[in-house]
Amino acid sequence: MTKKDNKKGFTIIEVVLVLAIAGLIFAMVFIALPALQRSQRDQSRKNDTSTVAAAINNWNSANRNGGTFSEESLRKYVDKLDQYDKSSELKVATPGASMSVASNEIKVMRGKKCPSSTPAPSADDPANITLQNGSSRNAAVVVLLENNGSQKQLYCQDV
């Protein structure tokens, strides 16, 4: 009689192969996660920019007789911001040809419009942006995005 050897289970090669594949998947997720988080924070900053732009439009509608908004009057029209503290990081800049924007603030300049071309990414924080002249009811809302991590990108929205 012949004795059959019917052992059940996995060989060491099969176990090592499964662990190697799982390790590769884990490494890919681990590498991609920071970029995904940066992208989500940047999208949230863009949404905050739109929220502030809508607040400026609401202020303009409520104050048809003119005048200029201040930080305090603008904050009344902003419910909440995701990436910024509206009481300390929402700032109205003094009108001028350019302004600097740090990564922890959202800045508004009255009477200006965004430049026609997007400023090049840089490692500067704060970064400077030169704005175009606009009417008294125009405003430019500017934030500094993380972009790819090593370089920052200015994002500007006209009102």
Which residues make up each language-model segment?
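N-terminal leader/signal peptides at the extreme start of proteins
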Residues: 1-10
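N-terminal signal-anchor/signal peptide hydrophobic helix marking the start
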Residues: 10-20
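C-terminal juxtamembrane segment of a hydrophobic transmembrane alpha-helix
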Residues: 22-40
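Membrane-proximal amphipathic alpha-helices
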Residues: 38-49
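Alpha-helix exit/C-cap motif
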Residues: 54-86
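Post-signal/leader-peptide non-cytosolic segments of secretory proteins
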Residues: 68, 91-103, 137-143
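Surface-exposed intrinsically disordered loops and tails
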Residues: 91-101, 109-132
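Short, surface-exposed interaction loops/tails
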Residues: 122-159
